[in-house]
Amino acid sequence: MIKLLKFYILLGCTALCLAGCAKENVVPEEEKAPVQEVEETKPVEDTAEETLETEKEYYPIKKGAIDYLSVKGIELEPGTEIAMVATNSENKFWDMVKSGAQKAVEDLNKELGYSGKDKISLTFTAPKEENVVDQINIIDQFLDKAPDALCIAFTDASASKTQIQMAKYNGIKLIAFDTPDDGQLTEALVGTDNKKAAAEVAEKLFEEIGYKGKVAIIVHNFLTQTGQDRKQAIVDVLANSYNDRDIQFVDIVYLAQEDRSEKEILDELLERNPDLAGIICTDLMTTEMVIDYAKELEEKNFAIAGFDSSEKIVKAVEEDVLIGTMSQDPYGMGYATITTAARAIAGQAKAGSIHSAHQWIDAENLQTEEVQSLLKFLSK
């Protein structure tokens, strides 16, 4: 406790400055959401051996000589504690990440022969909604508990700098997953190559509309690095490769920063642009939102390119509501996050940036063995 107190005193001025810079995200004390209880994740009941084997075959996560879908050779002390904080509990993407993380912890315990109190433990939690203050409150709880490693998918890394610095000061290994911290203070990042994946989505949409017409981008969140990177990659494809074509971005909507309802956003978009040619979505929630809206229309005259995968999204591809979707590999991402954290705790070699897989899915390749192997996690 003395060490923590000293740290808070040392960072007092820094925290005040950061609070000022991030004042948009700060609410008065009486308005803050109550601190959430953090519960330890239960052990995995389904070992999912088949899922992991197909992951390794079709979507390996390797960098250099290290296989991040393997726990072989990792040495951890009995009772090692790992915590993971996602952005929100409403997005099914994080359930898939959690499944992969649980499997990795199960494999570590099996490999090391740990049982009972000696088992490596995983706690996985997130605020109910994507809210900066709520996520910081959860991170603060974990800092009090001082796990061996803390893995975070940042909602707004700039608002979490004090927590990042505190973790490092107290020897907690800090791993970013899905979304990096903007100052690269974490030990490593495990996630999709968002710029590359989003650029591929833009290429698919532009091809579908014949390289002409009005296009809108529905971005999940301006504050997250994933939102910024995916949006910018889409814009850059047009600027760098098709600036001589008649393609025009007519609107870029940041869903998390909107006060309007989802229906109002899309109603107004089509009212202003009745000749809209296409919509590009940047995550699971924005994709499902546009799917739901499109299904209510009497006639849909625009193409939709999605991002992420779920049962609803796959069905929309089958029904030709979507031209396709860019599926990430959340199961593999979760597994690799744990092996990366374990390597950091053990002081073993690891890369600073580890890319999990992404795969464009459309009606033509949906039933292939490769794509189906990636979609197995949807039933988990």
Question: Where in this protein do the model-derived segments appear?
Answer:
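Flexible loop/hinge segments that line or gate small-molecule binding clefts
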Residues: 149, 157-196, 214, 310-318, ...
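C-terminal motif of bacterial Sec signal peptides marking the signal peptidase cleavage site
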Residues: 17-20
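Signal peptide-proximal N-terminal region
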Residues: 102-122, 239-246
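Hydrophobic alpha-helical
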Residues: 140-145, 149-168, 234, 254-315
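Hinge/cleft segment of the Venus flytrap/periplasmic-binding protein
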Residues: 32-34, 40-78, 225-226, 237-241, ...
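Hydrophobic alpha-helical segments within soluble ligand-binding/sensing domains
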Residues: 61-72, 135, 190-215, 229, ...
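Bacterial signal peptide processing site
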Residues: 22-24
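Extracytoplasmic "Venus flytrap"
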Residues: 59-77, 81-108, 123-136, 154-157, ...
